[in-house]
């Protein structure tokens, strides 16, 4: 017995958050009944997404895999981007199940990413409670003042009520900085720097 959103992430179909969105939009059924948040799957139940039966034979048999991949500039970390087919998933090796990204980088960034076939592991590593630090090397259009360096570590508003907060920011050389985060908000670094009227190069 598993909650459906957890089950879908366990078998590597998608992340737990994506599974929740599928359920909320009515795309998931168990035994022809639309699943609602919190519903559970029992052994023998027929699980479908958009009318397509999900193969659950790998449940509890699938070995956890993790790979590292260097994302290039211009690539997107998405399977469903109608505007850009240059997705990192086209470059990953074939496996049973699906690769799930552990965090992401935007189109205009490059760097190391981790991928796994286990949604629960991905969810655990991405969750703020895990406090896993990520390092970003960023070049800005101008040097950041000491006051603004302190402000970025205290936290600044970015968008939709969210706060961008750096664990550390260290000047490496001239306008280049090492930024340490333990959260993964969308465009957090770019929007935080924008708040202090700086741009990334």
Segments (PLM) and residue ranges:
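Basic, flexible Lys/Arg- and Gly-enriched helix-loop patches that mediate nucleic-acid binding at interfaces
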Residues: 1-201
């Amino acid at each position: 017995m598993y909650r459906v959103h957890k089950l879908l992430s366990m078998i590597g179909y998608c992340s737990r958050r994506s599974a929740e969105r599928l359920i909320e939009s009515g795309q998931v059924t168990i035994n022809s009944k639309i699943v609602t948040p919190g519903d559970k799957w029992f052994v023998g139940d027929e699980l479908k997404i958009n009318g397509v039966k999900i193969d659950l034979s790998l449940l509890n048999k699938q070995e956890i895999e993790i790979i590292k991949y260097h994302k290039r500039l211009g690539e997107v970390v998405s399977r469903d981007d109608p505007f850009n087919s240059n997705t990192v998933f086209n470059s990953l090796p074939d496996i049973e199940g699906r690769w799930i990204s552990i965090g992401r980088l935007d189109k205009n960034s490059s760097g190391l990413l981790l991928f796994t076939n286990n949604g629960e592991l991905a969810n655990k590593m991405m969750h703020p409670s895990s406090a896993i630090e990520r390092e970003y090397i960023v070049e800005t259009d101008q040097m950041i003042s000491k006051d603004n360096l302190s402000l970025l570590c205290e936290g600044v508003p970015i968008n939709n009520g969210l706060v961008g907060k750096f664990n550390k920011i260290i000047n490496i050389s001239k306008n280049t900085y090492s930024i340490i985060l333990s959260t993964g908000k969308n465009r957090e670094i770019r929007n935080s720097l924008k708040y202090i009227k700086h741009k990334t190069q």
